[in-house]
Amino acid sequence: MSRFLICSFALVLLYPAGIDMYLVGLPRIAADLNASEAQLHIAFSVYLAGMAAAMLFAGKVADRSGRKPVAIPGAALFIIASVFCSLAETSTLFLAGRFLQGLGAGCCYVVAFAILRDTLDDRRRAKVLSLLNGITCIIPVLAPVLGHLIMLKFPWQSLFWTMATMGIAILMLSLFILKETRPAAPAASDKPRENSESLLNRFFLSRVVITTLSVSVILTFVNTSPVLLMEIMGFERGEYATIIALTAGVSMTVSFSTPFALGIFKPRTLMITSQVLFLAAGITLAVSPSHAVSLFGITLICAGFSVGFGVAMSQALGPFSLRAGVASSTLGIAQVCGSSLWIWLAAVVGIGAWNMLIGILIACSIVSLLLIMFIAPGRPVAAHEEIHHHA
């Protein structure tokens, strides 16, 4: 079992590492490529576009051909794209490399969640996804620090060679450690069950909405945090970094505590708690009389996301024993596109950073609470259908 957990965690980590590690080198990259930092900031969106494009096909291929045939090319593409970025001499080539990086990371991301669905029952999967959420919270803090240390002695290209090295490690895991977890092709008697695993299932769609809104909350916070903390609240750059590190610490602490909470409380209780924390954060930020109260509201955001997201993802994947790859892809596409669409629309309409965050917090909590209360899980999948054993 440990091999599946290690491989899944490694496959997921390519996604945040690809986002956060290169940011510290952005000024030097812009200077070397004769581009402005503003022009290269689109590299974030290009990377996410690559991930979304990968998810359009990766899930279906993983369900038909297996998890390894998607993970291995995905890791290989991430390696090649990282080297391509390091060799880029124009901003256009650099952005093309970032898109290819996103394609590779997207393939690995989809496979990671499909593997967890294949190998864990509902309760254990919720615990593991909460732990995974805690680990991914470390990356936005550690990756820029690692990038800074690398750039003290080496040029910016070394950041992408480091990513390529990570990709090589994950490729080796996928080749030699990971075993195939895709369920055997269904017998004729199982065809009705395969056909019943519809993506239009009300329960699945409700969890897609909940997780997409939750990701929109956390990405809105990440995108608006420099404006909120430095421009509006007046913190210096060093103080901003400290606050972000502390919020990541809150996220990690809550994420690592959630598996223990699942041993005491029902998953539904934790999901309701998550949305109540979002609502409390929105109200706190809306009426905050001081910076200290606002910072408390920000910690509620991190706690709310960490306590509920892993549980909601586990519930979303629960109905899909034979189509876990497609379900994982659908979740990923909805989360990436939905959150990006909200942030873009809010910017186009001219909603300020503060109101943008408050608005998504309150909308997410109200919509999600209604869905949690009125759309309950269907019939649990039987134990022999839930966990697939492999040699």
Swiss-Prot record:
CDD domains with a match to the protein in the record: MFS_MdfA_MDR_like (cd17320)
UniProt entry keywords in alphabetical sequence: Antibiotic resistance, Cell inner membrane, Cell membrane, Membrane, Transmembrane, Transmembrane helix, Transport
GO cellular component, one term: plasma membrane
Topology within the bilayer: Multi-pass membrane protein
InterPro entries, sorted: MFS (IPR011701), MFS_dom (IPR020846), MFS_Efflux_Transporters (IPR050189), MFS_trans_sf (IPR036259), Multidrug-R_MdtL (IPR023697)
One Gene Ontology term of the molecular function aspect: transmembrane transporter activity
TM region(s), chain numbering: 4-24, 42-62, 69-89, 93-113, 131-151, 158-178, 203-222, 243-263, 269-289, 293-313, 331-351, 356-376
Keyword match Transmembrane: yes
Main localization, broad class: membrane
Superkingdom assignment: Bacteria
Gene3D superfamilies: Multidrug resistance protein D
Database matches in PROSITE patterns: MFS
GO biological process entries: response to antibiotic
Subcellular location: Cell inner membrane
HAMAP family, per database record: MFS_MdtL
Similarity-based family: Belongs to the major facilitator superfamily. DHA1 family. MdtL (TC 2.A.1.2.22) subfamily.
Function according to Swiss-Prot or TrEMBL: Confers resistance to chloramphenicol.
NCBIfam families (UniProt xref): PRK10473.1
Name used for this protein in its record: Multidrug resistance protein MdtL
Organism for this UniProt entry: Escherichia coli O7:K1 (strain IAI39 / ExPEC)
Gene symbol of the encoding locus: mdtL
